Every structure is written in C-alpha cells, then in structure tokens.
Design a protein with these regions (language model features):
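Extended, hydrophobic alpha-helical segments in both membrane/secreted and soluble proteins
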Residues: 212-220, 224
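Metal-dependent amide/peptide-bond hydrolase catalytic core
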Residues: 1-207, 211, 215
Length: 228
C-alpha cells in the first residue's frame, strides 16, 4: 500500500520541504528498519518512502471503530450503527476546516447523506445511507525554516550541550498548537524534544529515561543562555 489518501484535493495545499530540509532528512540516520523490528511490522505504508519524508504529507487515520459487541458479549442482532473516529494530521499549508470539508464531500460522493446531527424519522425513510459527521475544532500546522536565524541559534546551542552530533529534523508530528504563536504573537517557534524514542507516548507505561532528563536539563540551559 502507498498509504495515499484518496480524498479529492487532500494534498493540494501542501507546502513541500525545501531543498535544505530534504538534505537534512537524507543526512541523518533513519530508524525505519529498527521501527519495523520493534513494532513487528513487515511492510509500512509509503511505497518505500522514508518516514521523515512522509511527515511532509498530511494523513488521515482511523483511530477507532465501534459497532456491535464481539467475543462473550456478541449477540444475534443486526447493528443499527457503526462509529468511526478519524484523525487528521496536517502539514504546512493545510487548513483544518478546508480539510474536514474535503472529507465530508468525499463521504457524500460515496453515496451517503451527510448530517451534523441525528437524522429525523423522515430522513431515515428517505435516505438509505446516512452519515452523521461531527467535526471537532483543530489547528493548523507550523514549520520554522532551518535557515531562520532562531533555528540556527537553537541548533548551535543544542550542539554545544552535547558531545555527539545532534539530529536535525525539519518537521515532526504532534498535537502542538504552535501556529497560534506565529499567527497571533508573530513569534517563531522551534521544538527541541528530549524524550527517548521508546517512551510509549500517550499509552501505558509512558516514561522518560533519567539520562534523557539530565541531558534535557543541560540542553535547555544552553538554549536559555544562547545569544540570538
């Protein structure tokens, strides 16, 4: 599978990586093979593209599905509804409202009558396929160019706190409303993660290795006293 989202216009607004950002991606060690072993995945999506390259594209994830019960709770019934939780991960150039509108139009094109509320009895009799789509507010992506003076200053500061060569990644995934700082405060942001890669983020036994904590303290101290 290529992992490509089939929704019309899903990638139209994407601002691609610059040559400098692509060069940064190809200059660092890639964890793809290690991740396949650790996660037990034979073949990831992307048609051979690197994980960090795929982070330059928006994604559409199915976070959860629910219908009738299974296992010991299974019953001889016909489910009256099926529920799916969808998650949109945006990149620079996307607008969360435009993206959700594209999703709704795509569902309509599959033959569904789309509502943002429960259907009336009359609508249930009129339409064979009904989809209730509830959209929760989101926020857009933000990316600071590697060529920005602040990015260069942070890179220098972080490198000064470590004897090892630091890894510079032009973009990471995460639920961080950084674009609000840029939009309303005209401020520039740079993310400096310190967690270990196997920290089970947002899951059971989420953790931070003590050495990462100590290193992080030194890293943030270097950033706090850097000249910019």
């Amino acid at each position: 599978s290529t992992g490509k989202v089939l929704v019309e216009g899903f990638y139209d607004d994407v601002v691609p990586f610059t040559d400098e950002e692509r060069a940064a991606i190809h200059s660092i060690p890639h964890p793809d093979e290690q991740m396949k072993r650790e996660l037990g995945v034979a073949k990831p999506d992307g048609a051979g593209a690197l994980l960090l390259e795929m982070l330059s594209l928006p994604s559409l994830n199915i976070n959860g599905l629910r219908s009738a019960n299974v296992g010991v709770m299974a019953a001889n019934v016909i489910p009256t509804q099926a529920v799916a939780a969808l998650d949109l991960r945006l990149v620079l150039g996307n607008d969360w409202q435009r993206q959700t509108d594209k999703i709704k139009r795509h569902i309509q094109k599959q033959g569904w009558f789309v509502l943002d509320r429960d259907p009336t009895d009359e609508e249930r009799l009129q339409y064979a396929n009904i989809a209730k789509v509830r959209v929760y507010p989101g926020y857009n992506a933000q990316r600071t160019p590697l060529s920005h003076p602040l990015a260069k200053a942070v890179i220098t500061a972080v490198q000064s706190s470590s004897e090892e060569t630091i890894v510079i990644v032009p973009s990471l995934g995460g639920s961080l409303p950084l674009y609000l700082f840029e939009k309303y405060l005209q401020s520039t942001t740079v993310t400096v993660p310190i967690a270990n890669h196997d920290n089970n983020q947002h899951a059971e036994n989420e953790n931070l290795r003590l050495q990462n904590l100590w290193n992080g303290i030194e890293t943030f101290a270097a950033i706090m006293v850097m000249r910019f």
